[in-house]
Structures are given as C-alpha cells and as structure tokens.
Swiss-Prot record:
Keyword Lyase among record annotations: yes
Record-given protein name: Alginate lyase
Native source species: Photobacterium sp. (strain ATCC 43367)
Top enzyme category: lyase
GO molecular function, one term: poly(beta-D-mannuronate) lyase activity
Pfam families: Alginate_lyase2
Keywords: Lyase, Signal
Top-level division of the source organism's lineage: Bacteria
Family: Belongs to the polysaccharide lyase 6 family.
Signal sequence region: 1-20
Amino acid sequence: MIKSNLVISSLAIVSSMSYAGVEFSNPSGQLGEPANYTQFANILSASELQISDPNGKKGNKEYFALDNDFTGIVNDNFYVDKQSQALVFKMANDHLRNELRVQKNFRTDLPDHFYTLYANVEILHPLQSMANSTSKQNEITFLQVHNKGLDDQGTHNVPHPLLRVVWKENNQGVKGHFWAITKNNAVICKGSFGKKNKDKEMCRADVAYSKIDLGPAPTDKGTDFTITVGNKTLAIDVNGQRKVEKNIDYWRHLLSYFKAGVYNQFTQGESEAHFNQLRYQVNTP
C-alpha cells in the first residue's frame, strides 16, 4: 500500500503516516484523495509514486504504492483539487521530484505494440516559482519517457531519459514555452560509466540532444499531450497536432517506461502541475 518493504496492516485507518521525511496526511479532509477519483484509476492502477522529501538532500526520493494501492496516499504535494478535479503534483527545491512512474517496462521496437500516455496539464505560476532561482536551466519536467536498461533488473541502465517534456523559462530568447527534449543516442554521458564518453562529440549537448518547441504554455488552461512509443518511433501530439515523429531505432535495446508529475531543475522555489487528465494505454495484437 505504501512501501513494499513496510508491513503496516492498519495503514488504511490511520490519519497520518510518514517514511524518511515524506508524510501523508489529510486531517481536515480538504484534500481529495487520488485513490477515490475514478478518472485517475487507470493511471494509478498501473503506477507507483516516486516522491522526494522537499527538505532532504538533492536527488533524494522514496517509493510508495508499489502494489498500486494508493489508499491513504495524499498530502499537500499529491492530491486532487476538489473544485477543479485535477490531480495536483507539487515539489519544492532543485532536482527533487513528485512523479507517477508507470511500472510497465516496454520495448520500443515492436511493430505492433504501441504504448501511449495521455495528459491534459497546466503548469501553475512557473515564473513565480522561479523568481528567486539561481539556476541557468530553469525548467519543470512534467512528462518523461525513461529507460530501465536491458532488462527488468536494470542491467546497463542509461541515466538519461529518451524524452523530457518541460516548461522552460527561457530558451535562447523564447520564453514560457513547452519543449520536448529528446536524447539522440543511447550513449552514457555522465556518472562512472560515462567518464570515457563525456568529452566525446557524441556527448556534446547539441549532438546528444534535440530541443523541439511545442509552443507557448497557456497561463489559464490545460494543454493536451499524447506521447506514443512503438515501432521504433517516438510521436508527440500537442492539442491534437503532431509535433514530433522521431525514429528511435538507436533505443531499441532498452526497456522504457513513462513518468508524469514534476521534476525540478531550478532553485529556491516550488513547482505545481495540475493534471486534468492522465491516462495510460497499451495497444497490442
């Protein structure tokens, strides 16, 4: 229900619970508990929650609902807004996250297997979130296609996502737009395994990555995103228009998965994303 290595039989009846700095509580009942909203049953039944302690060290995260049971999983960072019925993700501080991780690890090369993530998302007050940031990046990542590695055990995982969909404050003078940031190869360019590659041309930012402008981010409504992976292709539709269709044959040896929520790449602020819709779909023979 909460964490796979915790055995807490009375968890569903307590009003507050915590682990390693992450606390779930809803004492006044003002927050909507995501498990109680049928419109999010599809995504919750396929996902676990990966969430940081906002007061913890950079990069920290804990794992919850590994059995897809989100009963009692609600706090000021993860809840449903009772008025708008949106699934809300919040997180403070740099390189911290609050994301649903779809548990299925899938092949990207099969010609008749397609994996799709649908989302209608509004990023709330991002400029205010970054008003005091000292980062040069100033991004909020809210959708991802990442990889597990060669197998479900995580062998030879590549520590770079295939895709990040971000709100970016400023990209060479283009302000307040959504961007698709895609990895153009499967080369490891950081960490101990990336030391031999990091200074090579294939790890240069302009070679290893592409940034595709997905258009200005509205400040008063959500935006529809459809991400589909299959048949060695990554496709992204925004408000029903195809924005990206990319051959990803170079990714075929890696098992991939979806993530949705918020991942901060800015300092001294808090991100907030409202998902009016969030669904996962698999089309196979």
